[in-house]
Amino acid sequence: MNRYVLEGIIRDAQAGKRILCVVPSREVQHIIDQLESASGIALLRRSHGDERVLFTSGGGITFAHARREAMRGHSADIVVIDDVYYLDQMFRLHADLKVIVAAASGEIITYT
């Protein structure tokens, strides 16, 4: 995840937004390492498969793999997808992720 995307999701989470990052599991710990220094963190969880960062504002960043079962039960204001990893699955992913952001009238953001 590049620093511009990271800065944006930190600001949104600090502002109370719920963000779901769809990234490969091998990237999650690296991203969390970069998030550690952000201000306003209430909880930083590194448990494999349950990684998340919650902010005092009520916002947070959770992580999921692109498998359907990994995304079940999530709701978010913003979904961020690294399309380099999931370009071949993008059509299916957008269909699955629309359900996650539907309740909040949120947005899906892809980046390379």
Locations of regions flagged by a protein language model:
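Short, flexible loop motifs at catalytic/binding sites
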Residues: 1-112
